[in-house]
Amino acid sequence: MKLPQLLLILLFVVLADSVQPKRCFSNVAGYCRKRCRLVEISEMGCLHGKYCCVNELENKRHKKDTVVEQPMEPRDKSKVQDYMVLPTITYYTITI
């Protein structure tokens, strides 16, 4: 009697595990599948020869906008600017 009960419990555990595909690793918002759907792209590989399928439309919505750096304003030429004198080495001198 315990064997059929154990088999029944294991059957439900296996079915519940395979209902939703596994998530991709490395912080990629996708699912591991054998074939990607039409609106999905393959980002990287998953285990057991599957692809990490990411929905293109969702991925574009969640991408963060990049911050554009402002160009530097030209300096006022009336201000004094520091400069640096580099040392030089003389290898030989020519006398005329």
Curated annotation (Swiss-Prot):
Q: Which keywords has UniProt assigned to this entry?
A: Antibiotic, Antimicrobial, Defensin, Disulfide bond, Secreted, Signal
Stretch forming the signal peptide: 1-21
The source's domain of life comes to Eukaryota
The principal localisation class reads secreted
Q: What Pfam families does this protein's entry cite? A: Defensin_beta_2
Which cellular compartments is it found in?
Answer: Secreted
Q: What's one GO BP annotation on this UniProt entry?
A: innate immune response
Q: Which InterPro entries does this entry report, sorted A to Z?
A: Beta-defensin, Beta_defensin_dom
Any one GO cellular component localisation term in the record: extracellular region
Q: Which Cys residues form disulphide pairs?
A: C24-C52, C32-C46, C36-C53
Family classification? Belongs to the beta-defensin family.
Report the function annotation for this chain. Has antibacterial activity.
Entry protein name: Beta-defensin 20
Q: Which gene encodes it?
A: Defb20
